[in-house]
Amino acid sequence: MSSVEELTQLFSQVGFEDKKVKEIVKNKKVSDSLYKLIKETPSDYQWNKSTRALVHNLASFVKGTDLPKSELIVNGIINGDLKTSLQVDAAFKYVKANGEASTKMGMNENSGVGIEITEDQVRNYVMQYIQENKERILTERYKLVPGIFADVKNLKELKWADPRSFKPIIDQEVLKLLGPKDERDLIKKKTKNNEKKKTNSAKKSSDNSASSGPKRTMFNEGFLGDLHKVGENPQAYPELMKEHLEVTGGKVRTRFPPEPNGYLHIGHSKAIMVNFGYAKYHNGTCYLRFDDTNPEKEAPEYFESIKRMVSWLGFKPWKITYSSDYFDELYRLAEVLIKNGKAYVCHCTAEEIKRGRGIKEDGTPGGERYACKHRDQSIEQNLQEFRDMRDGKYKPGEAILRMKQDLNSPSPQMWDLIAYRVLNAPHPRTGTKWRIYPTYDFTHCLVDSMENITHSLCTTEFYLSRESYEWLCDQVHVFRPAQREYGRLNITGTVLSKRKIAQLVDEKFVRGWDDPRLFTLEAIRRRGVPPGAILSFINTLGVTTSTTNIQVVRFESAVRKYLEDTTPRLMFVLDPVEVVVDNLSDDYEELATIPYRPGTPEFGERTVPFTNKFYIERSDFSENVDDKEFFRLTPNQPVGLIKVSHTVSFKSLEKDEAGKIIRIHVNYDNKVEEGSKPKKPKTYIQWVPISSKYNSPLRVTETRVYNQLFKSENPSSHPEGFLKDINPESEVVYKESVMEHNFGDVVKNSPWVVDSVKNSEFYVEEDKDSKEVCRFQAMRVGYFTLDKESTTSKVILNRIVSLKDATSK
């Protein structure tokens, strides 16, 4: 990784302005990629504004990852073949998908190289579009211009055209049709109340800005705010601190050390954020260290999953290391411990060790503790037997290396812990080199020391381990990191243990370890929960020394709030019934313009055609005319359709032989007496049009509505076992759901990153190619995302969370 000075110098050399350079170097992933891409160009290449922008664009796509054949794209840019950001995007996707097999010809074909669209051609398509939508434009006038731009931009015939030519042409042609703007195009003035709110809001903002002190976060208050500064943790050998500070430069250094023996769960997200976030807040560094000391339970899939989840949460390790990297040094220190008279080889059985530690036959502590018969063997004998363990002369269980601590201590962590055991298992990284493996209690503190960790942050279950942690470092004369403990995060109403989740998977109660009803991080991601929502949630909880037990509903509430601010809206019908408007012709079309997120113009808007046939929710119609609490469609009560000019009124029903409603006939109440206003309905409902012209509706293969997996808050307490507590309605699958055709735009633009989202405190840049980033609010139904099993011909949706309030009126 290049230094900031090197990055700044190179970016300035190719012509980026100082302000832009400062902006670029703030993003390490993008700046590192940009540096490498520039280095792939000839040293005498004459950069211009366009090529700088396009290569910067490419760097933002690469963002720190390895991209084989990236030189194909760079050469395409500097040779003038790739002229637009759209072409660069297409070229990037092609090279990313094909890797080393990528060719210049293949890239050019996939990115529109050589396709020239003239300004006259653009104008012809714009004029054609305006003619086709003339009535709507005449009605809605200039406020429709942004929508025209969006629609023209999406015309397949103009895919490779320069979008910079669109706006001036659209402006010219709209002006020809409508003439200059007049009073019809003026934006209505805000009311006095709105102005007052604005003033109060500005005052409040000003007051907040004026308040002294840094912004409050989980990293500068509570447990984390009270942590020691680098260099303040005491040492048995003060000279070691001097060496430590020289290595670290006085900066914070933390680590996240998972065991690669399973998938991470929601509790680990807090550990990830605490360790990576604390280091980042203090401009320090954080390791991702795999504690791979038990080869019998480790598997490559766990290593990869852990890396994915750390990256998904928005963190990049300073270095990825493995405890196995240090096996040679750990072995050397074990011999040092023996030579110092502080370790011995023990041949006791597991039961004998328990009795020596005062564990009674019924498993309870409190019995008399006594020394093992091997404890006072000579140093020479212990050293020889330990080497025999290393050389495979003992079978598993026949010999262990134990630390000689203090059996009179009240802490179980000082009762001669095991340091090494014999395991005849090949290691994923070291193969068959070792027949003995260090334990967590021996490895953890020493590797922390080797990596010069300044703050060894772990959960309170390891509180007693602090004494043995410090004891071992001191006995082998190494730097002693400071272990500090915070409360773990638990979610009630579910299970997090690997054994129980494995049982759920093996017995087919769930689809797999990433089933959206589980709380593994893989499952939460598949369900569609944004990583930013998790970080925001953890920040809200803060960090203390108390264990945090959170109900699922509270977690979902936090996710819902995050989604509310960051997702577009679409009309979607879960359980559809067809509606036919009898007083409208088959070719009737009324275009409704609907914002993707009301109140946030930057999300844009879309057009939905109202025709003489559409779908509504089956539950939005009731034959009961006496229910005064039901505000939707009934035989004697009209209902409004979202963004449609008039209400619809019931006319008749069609039912099948079983009595199920298959079609509702209505009238469109568009005949209003002159001088009168349309009658306002009691409520509005969502609808999805039936229109072959617009390829509507989009039919959903499966809509999976997820509820809590278990019926109680503590499944493990069920007298017949946790499996008996499973909620039979935890997954409800709908096979006939429909939604508006604009879902295609949502997929194309996902993740939906507008400025208000990108500038939020916990925004995390996500992989555009992952299906779960395609999130949206199904109006009046819930929040949904694409499931990983979806294909171009098969749409499968997962419900992330429900809306706040169930629709009851």
From Swiss-Prot:
A motif ('KMSKS' region) lies at residues 495-499. Residues 185-198 have a biased composition (Basic and acidic residues). L-glutamine binds at D291, Y440. Residues 185-216 are annotated as: Disordered. GO terms for molecular function: ATP binding; glutamine-tRNA ligase activity; mRNA binding; sequence-specific mRNA binding. Present with 37500 molecules/cell in log phase SD medium. This is Glutamine--tRNA ligase.
